[in-house]
């Protein structure tokens, strides 16, 4: 569970200005 949360947080951080969710 923690691993998935960390991954989602990383995705959010990467989405600082790039459409990672769309990638």
Swiss-Prot record:
Any one GO cellular component localisation term in the record: mitochondrial inner membrane
Signal peptide span: none
Localization per Swiss-Prot or TrEMBL: Mitochondrion inner membrane
Principal location class: mitochondrion
Keyword Transmembrane helix on entry: yes
Membrane topology: Single-pass membrane protein
Example of a GO MF term: oxidoreductase activity
One biological process term in Gene Ontology: mitochondrial respirasome assembly
Glycoprotein keyword on record: no
Task of the protein: Component of the mitochondrial respiratory complex IV (CIV, also named cytochrome c oxidase complex), the last enzyme in the mitochondrial electron transport chain which drives oxidative phosphorylation. The CIV complex is the component of the respiratory chain that catalyzes the reduction of oxygen to water. Acts as an assembly factor that specifically drives the homodimerization of CIV complexes, mediating the formation of mitochondrial respiratory supercomplexes (respirasomes) containing two CIV: supercomplxes with two molecules of CIV show improved activity.
Protein name: Cytochrome c oxidase subunit 7A1, mitochondrial
Naturally occurring in which organism (per UniProt): Canis lupus familiaris (Dog)
Gene coding for it: COX7A1
């Amino acid at each position: 569970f923690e691993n998935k949360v960390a991954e989602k947080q990383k995705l959010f951080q990467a989405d600082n200005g790039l459409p990672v969710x769309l990638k």
